[in-house]
UniProtKB/Swiss-Prot annotation:
<comment type="subunit">
    <text>Microtubule inner protein component of sperm flagellar doublet microtubules.</text>
</comment>
<keyword id="KW-0966">Cell projection</keyword>
<keyword id="KW-0969">Cilium</keyword>
<feature type="coiled-coil region">
    <location>
        <begin position="279"/>
        <end position="334"/>
    </location>
</feature>
<feature type="coiled-coil region">
    <location>
        <begin position="153"/>
        <end position="250"/>
    </location>
</feature>
<dbReference type="InterPro" id="IPR008805">
    <property type="entry name" value="RIB43A"/>
</dbReference>
<dbReference type="GO" id="GO:0160111">
    <property type="term" value="C:axonemal A tubule inner sheath"/>
</dbReference>
<keyword id="KW-0175">Coiled coil</keyword>
<dbReference type="GO" id="GO:0030317">
    <property type="term" value="P:flagellated sperm motility"/>
</dbReference>
<keyword id="KW-0963">Cytoplasm</keyword>
<protein>
    <recommendedName>
        <fullName>RIB43A-like with coiled-coils protein 1</fullName>
    </recommendedName>
</protein>
<dbReference type="Pfam" id="PF05914">
    <property type="entry name" value="RIB43A"/>
</dbReference>
<comment type="similarity">
    <text>Belongs to the RIB43A family.</text>
</comment>
<keyword id="KW-0206">Cytoskeleton</keyword>
<keyword id="KW-0282">Flagellum</keyword>
<dbReference type="GO" id="GO:0036126">
    <property type="term" value="C:sperm flagellum"/>
</dbReference>
Length: 378
C-alpha cells in the first residue's frame, strides 16, 4: 500500500511546539489562581496581605495584653486568697489560745462542784485549835464558799473582759472583711474599666480596618473594570485581525501551490493539501491491485503448506497409534509371563514349607534339654 506518513518538517514542528507552549502559558496565567497576574491588581492584593498581617499582629498584641492582665488578676486573687487564709489561721489561733488560757476546766462555773480538793483549800477562819470546840461547834461545812462574793466579782470581770475582747475581734474581722470586699470591688472595677477600654479600642480598630478595606476594594474594583475594558478591546481587535487573516489565507482560497515543498517535491503539507490528482489516484489503485495479487499468491502458498503439515500430522498420528498397539501387546505378554513365573515360585515355596514342617521341625525339645543351661554361677 502507498504510505503517506512521511517525516514532518523540523521547522514546522518547532513552530507548532512554540504555539503550544504559548497557549499553555496563557492558560496558566488565566486559570492558575495562585500565580494569576492578568486582570488582577497585584499591588492591592499585596496591600491586603500586609493589612492582614498588621491586623494579625494587633490581635496577637491584644491577646498578649489580655494574657498579662489575666496573669495580674490571677496573682492578685492568689494574694487575696493567701491573705484570707492567713487571717482565718490567725483568728483560729487566737480562738484556740483563748480557749486554752481563759476557758480551762478549772476556771469553769461547774468546777467548784466537781473539785475534790476544793474543801481542803479553806482553813478554819477563827481558831486553829480544835480542842476548844465540840462536835456541834463546826466552823466550816462541805460545799460552803466563804469568798463567794469576791469570786462572783472576779467571774463578772473576766466575763466582761472576754466579751469586750470578742467584740473587738469581731469588729476587727468585720473591718478586715470590709477592706477585702473594697479591694475586690476596686479590682473588679479596674478590670471592667480596662475591658471597656480595650473593647472601645478594638471597635475603633475594626472601624478603621473596615474603612480602609472598603476604600481598597473600591480602588481595586475600578482598576479591575478598566483592565476588563482594555482586555475586551484588545480581544476584539485580535478577533478582527484573525478573521481578516483567515479570509485572505491560502486555506480558504484553496491555493494548490501552498501544499508543495520546495526542498522536498515528493512531500506535501497535510494542513494545506487539497487532495490527489487523477494520476496519483491511478498509481495508488495499480499499487493496491499488485498488493492484492501478491496477497492472493501468498494465501495459496500458505494453504499448500498447511495441507502438507496436515498430511504429515496424520501420518505421525497413525504411527503413534501403531506404536501404542505394539506397546499394549508387549505389556500383555509380559503380564502373562510374570503370572506363570509367580505361580511356579509359589509352588516351590509351598513345597519348601511342607518339607520344613514335616521333616525339619518334627523333633520338639523336652524339659531335660532346657535343664542343661544356667547350671553354674559363672
Amino acid at each position: 500500500m502507498y504510505k503517506l506518513d512521511l517525516a514532518p518538517d523540523p521547522k514546522e514542528l518547532a513552530a507548532i511546539e512554540a504555539r503550544r507552549n504559548r497557549e499553555k502559558e496563557r492558560q496558566c496565567r488565566f486559570f492558575n489562581v495562585r500565580n494569576r497576574v492578568m486582570g488582577v491588581d497585584v499591588e492591592a492584593l499585596n496591600y491586603q496581605v500586609e493589612e492582614r498581617k498588621f491586623r494579625e499582629a494587633i490581635e496577637r498584641s491584644k491577646d498578649m495584653a489580655y494574657g498579662a492582665k489575666h496573669a495580674h488578676y490571677d496573682l492578685v486573687a492568689q494574694m487575696l486568697e493567701k491573705e484570707e487564709a492567713e487571717r482565718a489561721c490567725r483568728l483560729s489561733k487566737r480562738v484556740q489560745d483563748f480557749r486554752e488560757q481563759r476557758q480551762q476546766f478549772k476556771n469553769g462555773h461547774e468546777f467548784d462542784f466537781w473539785d475534790p480538793d476544793h474543801v481542803q483549800e479553806f482553813q478554819v477562819p477563827y481558831y486553829e485549835n480544835e480542842a476548844y470546840f465540840g462536835p456541834a461547834s463546826m466552823q466550816y461545812f462541805l460545799g460552803e464558799d466563804l469568798e463567794r462574793a469576791s469570786h462572783l466579782r472576779m467571774q463578772q470581770e473576766q466575763l466582761r473582759y472576754n466579751l469586750e475582747k470578742q467584740l473587738q475581734e469581731q469588729q476587727a474581722a468585720r473591718e478586715e472583711e470590709a477592706r477585702a470586699a473594697l479591694l475586690s470591688d476596686q479590682l473588679r472595677l479596674a478590670a471592667d474599666t480596662r475591658a471597656a477600654e480595650l473593647a472601645r479600642l478594638e471597635e475603633s480598630c475594626r472601624a478603621a480596618m473596615r474603612t480602609a478595606m472598603a476604600n481598597a476594594n473600591k480602588a481595586q474594583a475600578a482598576k479591575q473594570a478598566l483592565l476588563q475594558r482594555r482586555e475586551q478591546q484588545q480581544q476584539q481587535e485580535a478577533n478582527l485581525a484573525e478573521i481578516k487573516k483567515q479570509v485572505t489565507s491560502d486555506l480558504l482560497t484553496e491555493n494548490p501551490q501552498v501544499a508543495q515543498r520546495p526542498s522536498a517535491p515528493h512531500r506535501v503539507l497535510p494542513y494545506c493539501w487539497k487532495g490527489m490528482t487523477a494520476e496519483q489516484r491511478a498509481a495508488i489503485r495499480k499499487t493496491q491491485e499488485n498488493q492484492r495479487q501478491e496477497k492472493k499468491e501468498q494465501r495459496q502458498a500458505e494453504k499448500l503448506v498447511e495441507a502438507e503439515w496436515g498430511s504429515q500430522s496424520k501420518r505421525l498420528a497413525e504411527a503413534a497409534l501403531e506404536l501404542e498397539e505394539q506397546e499394549r501387546e508387549l505389556c500383555a505378554e509380559f503380564r502373562r509371563g510374570l503370572g506363570s513365573f509367580n505361580r511356579e515360585l509359589a509352588k516351590e515355596q509351598h513345597a519348601q514349607q511342607n518339607y520344613l514342617n514335616s521333616v525339619i521341625y518334627t523333633n520338639q525339645p523336652t524339659s531335660h534339654y532346657y535343664l542343661q543351661f544356667n547350671t553354674s554361677s559363672r
